[in-house]
Amino acid sequence: MRVVRQLNELEEALTLSRSEAKNAFGDDNVLLERFIEGPRHIEFQIFGDQHGNFVHLHERECSIQRRHQKILEESPSPFLDGTLRKQMAEASLKAANAVQYLGAGTVEFIVGEDRSFYFIEMNTRLQVEHPVTEMQTGLDLVEWQIRVASGEKLPLDQDQIRPQGHSIEAVSYTHLTLPTIVGV
């Protein structure tokens, strides 16, 4: 991967990237994408039922990472203001509605320093971080998933889902930095 900040850097970066791709994978095709300065990783928990109802259960921020692994998962995001939070929530519901999504899902975005946001992916399941949302909303998302899978309507409408307080989940990583000692 290479970041190109000036147009005159593009040709050389593309040539090098194609060469590396060819050597590593036998194919010199490359993908160009926008580089986001100071990215924030924000995800919205959503639910859809068989009756055409969709809700979001607010956001989680997981921008603090090490080696692309989440360290902190936090709700609400300290980065989002009310306007951006509303825009992203609406985009999440629009995505769910577009595919008539059923069950629990997570719509993930990257947000730049300029507060522009970009869709990354949708995870079509409850994620391991869902207790952050449960703590902040007071709702049992596993129960919701079972009810929706059984054909029931969503238990609450959007205006009944209110965040309460602040929730943080932390992961502790241990890395052995000394040479491994046999038997230890």
Predicted regions and their residues:
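Single conserved hydrophobic/aromatic residue that forms the stacking wall/gate
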Residues: H175-V184
